Amino acid sequence: MNEFTLNAEQRSDLGKGASRRLRRLASLVPAVVYGGDKAPESISMLAKEVAKLLENDAAYSHIIELNVGGKKQNVIIKALQRHPAKGHVMHADFVRVIAGQKLTAIVPIHFLNEEAPVKKGGEISHTTTELEVTCLPKDLPEFIEVDLGSLEVGDNVHLSELKAPKGVEFVALAHGTDLAIANVHAPRIVKDEEEGEAEEGAAE
């Protein structure tokens, strides 16, 4: 049984006004399912079920079993529209997953051994926190690991240095873009401290 499941119902009342009514009156999240050889479907889901599903970060990059009126299909999250202030999901886009057919998905990065460069006096900047990948459904990773343990102050990590899991391709590299993933830099001196030292020097 799929660890990630979501129930939904088809909706025929479309448009921005209808979507607002769904959210306000029925606590529902409007969504669209597309891809494969089927026509796009407009659906709605209980907001509380969507929120519960997304409590697990793995859901963002995992195949979800979507039950629409009793008919099950496998999908992945393509995009989420959130409320700018409250953060809850206002609309969702799902893409159907077809066995044997490659898919494109966004996968989070998990950084390992971050304490090592920090102990050497460095500060870590995460330039990229998720990656777009292409693979077959069976090869879809929940995350990509990046080990920072060997980095020194001044070092950085680029996408080309990462080893993609078997069967997985990084979309950016395929398009000739070598993304910066993370870097280790010397701690920035707080401006107030610099001013304080300057004042002390002037007083002397």
Swiss-Prot record:
Part of the 50S ribosomal subunit; part of the 5S rRNA/L5/L18/L25 subcomplex. Contacts the 5S rRNA. Binds to the 5S rRNA independently of L5 and L18. This is one of the proteins that binds to the 5S RNA in the ribosome where it forms part of the central protuberance. GO terms for molecular function: 5S rRNA binding; structural constituent of ribosome. Keywords: Ribonucleoprotein, Ribosomal protein, RNA-binding, rRNA-binding. The keyword Ribosomal protein applies. This is Large ribosomal subunit protein bL25. CDD domains: Ribosomal_L25_TL5_CTC. InterPro entries: Rbsml_bL25/Gln-tRNA_synth_N, Ribosomal_bL25/Gln-tRNA_synth, Ribosomal_bL25_b-dom, Ribosomal_bL25_C, Ribosomal_bL25_long, Ribosomal_L25_dom, Ribosomal_uL5_bac-type. Belongs to the bacterial ribosomal protein bL25 family. CTC subfamily. It comes from Pseudomonas syringae pv. syringae (strain B728a). GO terms for biological process: translation. GO terms for cellular component: cytosolic large ribosomal subunit.
